[in-house]
Amino acid sequence: MEKMSHDPIAADIGTQVSDNALHGVTAGSTALTSVTGLVPAGADEVSAQAATAFTSEGIQLLASNASAQDQLHRAGEAVQDVARTYSQIDDGAAGVFA
């Protein structure tokens, strides 16, 4: 039978994934200002339509990015929870043998 174990570094990896996701959300929020603040290149109708299309597409991509960052954050928290559970069980089992 194979021994089950985990590497305690998993909690650190989960924390890093969660932190990276939070940085991604911050970057998306910063980009929102640039995406929504685009001024048409000229006074013509084509420039106005291009600016509107750019803004619309940018907002959709940033919403998708925010959703992805949320999922990454949840995944990082799940890894942290698993590592915490393993540590608690290992500590409890070690107490039985001590």
Swiss-Prot record:
Major place of residence: secreted
Start and end residues of each PE domain: 1-90
Keyword tags: Secreted, Virulence
Cellular component per GO, a single term: extracellular region
Pfam families hit by this protein: PE
Location of the protein in the cell: Secreted; Cell surface
Superkingdom of origin: Bacteria
InterPro entries: PE-PGRS_N
Functional description taken from the UniProt entry: Plays a major role in RD1-associated pathogenesis, and may contribute to the establishment and maintenance of M.tuberculosis infection. Together with PPE68, stimulates the secretion of IL-10 and MCP-1 from human macrophages, via the interaction with human Toll-like receptor 2 (TLR2).
Record text on subunit structure and interactions: Interacts with PPE68. PE35/PPE68 complex interacts with human TLR2.
Family: Belongs to the mycobacterial PE family.
Name listed for the protein in its UniProt record: PE family immunomodulator PE35
Species: Mycobacterium tuberculosis (strain CDC 1551 / Oshkosh)
